[in-house]
């Protein structure tokens, strides 16, 4: 029986499709829903690390760049939380018992840890559709989760 569904969402356009699949599943099972977004500097849309972008002539990190990075990261965090709350509002309007969490870390590990601590019966997530070579170099969050999470996984393809 599926009574707890954890959905991992990011800021990609695919997240809307993933959320729609999750709504259907959660309603069908009359399950509780946990919405998760993991803030990671490895996300394709996260602010660039100023250590990479702004080494000065003397190898010093510009304080302007550090402030800019901090401001960009705060905006990224706020926009991500607003999107997650939009999904939460839709789930609540659909009559679903819903929680949300946004945290920092390695997405694969955070998903697996939360699935275990929250006692999820099902994890719903997407995959990026990267090439095998890109997956080999960069890894794959969905591949990590499939092999490490203690419950079933529903994978939404792009």
Predicted ranges, named:
Residues 151-158:
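Short, flexible loop segments at boundaries between secondary-structure elements
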Residues 42-43, 74, 78-123:
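Structural beta-alpha unit
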Residues 37, 127-128, 158:
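Short secondary-structure boundary segments
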Residues 122-147:
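Glycine-rich, Arg-bearing micro-motifs that act as flexible, cationic patches
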Residues 3-67, 94, 99:
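Small/aliphatic-rich secondary-structure junction motif
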């Amino acid at each position: 029986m599926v009574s707890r569904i954890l959905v991992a969402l990011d800021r990609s356009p695919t997240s809307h499709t993933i959320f729609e699949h999750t709504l259907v599943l959660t309603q069908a099972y009359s399950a509780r829903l946990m919405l998760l977004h993991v803030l990671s500097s490895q996300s394709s849309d996260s602010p660039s690390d100023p250590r990479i972008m702004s080494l000065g002539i003397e190898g010093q990190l510009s304080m302007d760049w550090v402030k800019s990075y901090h401001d960009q990261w705060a905006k990224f965090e706020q926009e991500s939380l607003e999107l997650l709350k939009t999904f939460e509002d839709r789930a609540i309007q659909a009559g679903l018992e819903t929680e949300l969490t946004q945290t920092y870390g390695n997405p694969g590990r955070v998903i697996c840890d939360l699935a275990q601590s929250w006692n999820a019966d099902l994890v719903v997530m997407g995959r990026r559709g990267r090439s095998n070579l890109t997956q080999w170099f960069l890894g794959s969050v969905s591949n990590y989760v499939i092999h490490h999470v203690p419950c079933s996984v529903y994978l939404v393809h792009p």
